[in-house]
Regions:
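Nucleotidyltransferase catalytic core that binds NTPs
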Residues: 1-176
Length: 176
């Protein structure tokens, strides 16, 4: 079994690349971290919403999806997380996660992401925060499609999921 771990806030093309790599190798578990997080700019979507985004992207492809609450204790994280995602090979492009799992003698498959900095969650969320001030849906979509898979973009638009970012940043003015 292959495991892809992330917060998926939101599920973006970097995540899609990792999950594709895992699915090509065999049965895959997608582990959604920070499952208990209260809404914030770092974690704007609930674990249920993030799972919906992932399932929308997966379509008819099969993957097991599990939710993992944070424990804020890196030395014990792998033991905690493996209670939810089971044992297998972690597929990652994150150096810190790789080292943490290797230290726990977990097999790790390293995936090299070109332009990884473009797919960092904070950068994607910052762009979405800016887009939350734009009323024109097609303009929003065109920008989002650069870093987010089309089916997830559709989910974000259909569920008015960017509005939450605007509401969390009330000092922003709407444009366009």
């Amino acid at each position: 079994m292959y495991i892809v771990l992330g917060r998926f806030q939101p599920f973006h093309k970097g995540h899609a690349y990792l999950v594709e790599a895992a699915l090509e190798k065999g049965p895959t578990t997608i582990a959604i971290g920070s499952s208990q997080s209260e809404p914030s700019m770092n974690n704007p979507w609930s674990v249920g919403e993030r799972e919906e985004m992932i399932r929308e992207w997966l379509g008819d492809r099969e993957a097991n999806i599990v939710h993992i609450a944070d424990i804020n204790d890196p030395p014990n994280w792998v033991e905690h997380a493996s209670n939810f995602h089971g044992h297998g090979t972690l597929v990652t492009s994150d150096e810190d996660t790789k080292m943490l799992y290797e230290k726990s003698e977990f097999p790790v498959e390293w995936v090299n992401l070109s332009e990884r900095e473009s797919f960092e969650g904070w950068r994607v969320r910052a762009t979405l925060k800016m887009l939350s001030t734009v009323h024109e849906k097609e303009a929003q979509k065109q920008v989002m499609l650069q870093t987010i898979p089309p089916k997830v973009v559709d989910w974000l638009v259909e569920n008015d999921a960017l509005y939450r970012l605007y509401a969390m940043s009330r000092d922003l003015e709407h444009v366009g």
